[in-house]
Amino acid sequence: MAPTAVFSNPATNPVANLKASVKTAEGVPATLNDLLLQATEMYPSHELSFITSSAHDSSVQARTFQDFNQRVRNLASALAAWKKPAGEVVVVYLTEHEDNMSAVWACLLAGLVPCLQPALSAQQEHKEGHIAHIRKLFGSATWLTNDAGAMQLDTIKGLDVHLFSDLLASAEKSSVAANYVARQSQPDDEAILFLTSGSTGFSKAVVHTHRTIINACIAKGANYRLTPQTNILNWVGFDHVAGSLEMHIAPLLYGCSQLHVHASAILSDPLLLLRLIDERSIDIAFAPNFLLAKMVRDLEKRTDLHGKFDLSSLRRMNSGGEAVVSKTAVAFVQLLKKLGRNPSKVSFKVAAGFGMTETCAGCIYDVVDLAENSPKHEFLALGAPVHGCEMRIVDPEDGATPRSDGQPGELQVRGPMIFVRYYNNPEATKSSFVEGGWYRTGDIGIIENGNMRLSGRIKDTVIVHGVSYGIPELETYLQTVQGVTHSFLAAAPYRAPGQETEGFVVFYAPTFDLQGDDASKKLSETHRAIKDVSVKMMTLPPQHIVPIPMDQMEKTTLGKLSRARLLSQFVQGALAKHVARAEELISMARGASFVTPSTDDEKALAAIYAGIFNLQSNEVSARDNFFELGGTSIDVIRLKREGEAHFGLSEIPIIQILKNPIVSDLAKYVNGLVNNDASANEYDPIVPLQLSGDKTPIFFVHPGVGEVLIFVNLAKYFQNERPFYAFRARGFEPGHPFFGSMDEMVTSYANAMKKTQPKGPYAIAGYSYGGVVAFEVAKRLESMGEEVKFVGLINIPPHIADRMHEIDWTGGMLNLAYFLSLVTKQDATDLHPKLKTMTKEEQLEVVWKLAPPERVTELQLTPGKLDHWVSIAGSLIECGKSYNPGGNVSAVDVFYAIPLKGSKEDWLNKQLKPWSQFSRGEPQFIDVPGQHYTLMDFDHVPQFQKIFRGRLEARGL
């Protein structure tokens, strides 16, 4: 009989290891309050360090354990003055690690229960629904937040909102004893509440007691081999169990010094992770699969960085949150060896892990030296449970029958680190456990020889770059697509071989006959609509869309489609005939509208398009749109380069590719260049980035660099919804003078906007510098009697003149170089004082030498072109030096991210709030992820577009 797939870790007792490691006579602390006091008394000079979201120079602020202990006990005393009953829940909604950390410990010491709130939804309806839900769940509505959070809560009545800054001010008035507690806690008291993602409905509140957290921390410390000499680097938000329990409380128990970095700093500049490992002698850090992939993608060609970092201290890199692609992890290890100053001393292990909010984060790990051991599977195995944790694989139907070793089934875990219940939700708690105290994780796994790996999911979510998206919500919207039979649609998570992140497949029964004469047209329209909805909700289209006749889609006895069964059939090839029929119909639909390239220029461009998109030349129509085929801003550079080489042209302006993305249109433009047609060089500020859809068009004004490439990836999200136009500054093409004043620019853009869209209502937005231009264009249109229903101002204050006067030629050049990724943020900051003493030519030469060769090639830059671009940006700065805002528009929506300087709160309250004076209607201030220069980049644009489109809809567009 085959052994059953049940496994527990027989390792030595970690409690004994803890006592030996920290040399404590007091023993293991019984509560978190005891844990903090013990760490303070034993390691008073060890440090908690922080890099905030506003630390643009990555400067580190540090507090000793002793200093931090005094700070939070003073805060606890101030909290006690609120006179809240013991055990009342306080929703902690803060941004920075130190603030969150301080607030949580203060609540614990005051006898209150902190609940960590992740970022609230930008969708007003969803935000209000969530807040109403947790208010009902907790029976109270006490929030501790900052100014930005208070603004988000301002429209919701009945909340007891307290500012953390006020609490700090109160705490500074007194100094309590170093062992002060307002109320004593017991091991089984509720300690901290964590909200689940809510991807399958409203969030549940996971209850962790002092006992479960301490048990988890002891086990983690043993697995990580923590000692008081260990240095930890964490960038995961404190509202996540990994950021708070795994990377703060567990290390604190063992006396480890810690560096907590705001996520935006790492995600916008992954090199910072390596610099900090080097500078702070970091032993343990964390990087999920998407960050490993990003670092490999961004740095593998940076030969200039080889040997630049001392990475010898690093001994473990944790990875979790999504499956880790084996080849990505191996490439990451190889990359760090190349970047290491002494490759032979770069010897760390990658620890892929499994964990959930309910398990106090990671509870199963596979710690592997990938330089010595090659992975056996496409994704890294997840290994064995930490001490005290058990795992087993059972039949998912009954949740109890053990599966044999090597057979897939439902993964269940149990142990002293598992949560005790969902707050005020006995039904959900009961359904999450089976007899024997086994917790149902909702994942499909396989255990072979004590080593676990995941093979799928039972729960209805898709994880894209570590972000969880709900399948049921997607299905609800897809059910409304014309061509889909209601209740006969299912979506299932799916990861294709070699894919770096999870995706999904959509199965549906069409309302039309798949064998009918009009099937190709109807199926093409239906699939396009399914893709559009999916991209807007999940940030990516389905990997496959499979139409199945309704009589062949089996439902359960409860009248539901089985996602698991459909996906199994798909993977095994049982649905191959339906996939083939869909491909045949799509091909027929394409053939019906196919226009064969006729001129030599069209044929040449069709061949170039085909090469870029891995098509045959005869598959490209003369009416094919470069961006609808999937073209990105990087692909534009390749098209430009190959087109210039084929046609023997010194320059095909990128702007003209953006304006003429259709094969026949671009061929006509290129023909004009070849034949020196003067009309091909006329200035038109409008760049149509996508033209499909019948909703009100959106017009975007360029940032201070004058170019519109930043908008290319954003425009894709508006396909089949509304046209997307961008304004490009004058002066890029030969013979085009720079704008001489703000008024001249506004007049040009307003006239072009009216020519493109003769009547309102209008929608306009501007990024950075473009925000004030958009505001002025909106005013001009209103003065013409037109209605402007949306004015979007992205991370720009109304008063810019002082800033324009601050930017000298060197600063403007470095801003442009950083914006174009020619230099790093750190380089741009450090170089300014050094370059100011040089001539312009010498300054450009320094930047040119620092620029990555592949980036220069991508942008088709030369020193002369860079110099000219700096001049264009300088002309826009000159236009802004005398700008003084006045008048008003119907309403403004101000989107704000982490600013170039200062804190986000000061940026909002002191710089952006004055827009209220220029808005007749109620202005809206909307927090968006990322930093000033990264909020629309590849990593942030999926979230930005959802927030931005939500505001368009809120304004009735």
Swiss-Prot record:
SUPFAM superfamilies: Acetyl-CoA synthetase-like, ACP-like, alpha/beta-Hydrolases. It is an enzyme of class 2 (transferase). Atromentin has been shown to induce caspase-3 and poly (ADP-ribose) polymerase (PARP) in human leukemia U937 cells. It also has anticoagulant activity. Moreover, atromentin has antimicrobial activity. It acts especially as an inhibitor of FabK, the enoyl-acyl carrier protein (ACP) reductase of S.pneumoniae. It comes from the Eukaryota. InterPro entries: AB_hydrolase_fold, ACP-like_sf, AMP-bd_C_sf, AMP-binding_CS, AMP-dep_synth/lig_dom, ANL_N_sf, PKS_thioesterase, PP-bd_ACP. Optimum temperature is 25 degrees Celsius. Keywords: Phosphopantetheine, Phosphoprotein, Transferase. Signal peptide: none annotated. Residues 697-947 are annotated as: Thioesterase (TE) domain. Optimum pH is 6.5. Disulfide bonds: none annotated. Residues 59-464 are annotated as: Adenylation (A) domain. Belongs to the ATP-dependent AMP-binding enzyme family. The L-tyrosine:2-oxoglutarate aminotransferase atrD and the atromentin synthetase atrA catalyze consecutive steps to turn over L-tyrosine into atromentin, which represents the generic precursor molecule for the entire terphenylquinone and pulvinic acid family of pigments, which are widely distributed secondary metabolites in homobasidiomycetes. The first step is catalyzed by atrD which converts L-tyrosine in to 4-hydroxyphenylpyruvate (4-HPP). This is Atromentin synthetase. It comes from Tapinella panuoides (Oyster rollrim mushroom). The lineage of its organism: Eukaryota, Fungi, Dikarya, Basidiomycota, Agaricomycotina.
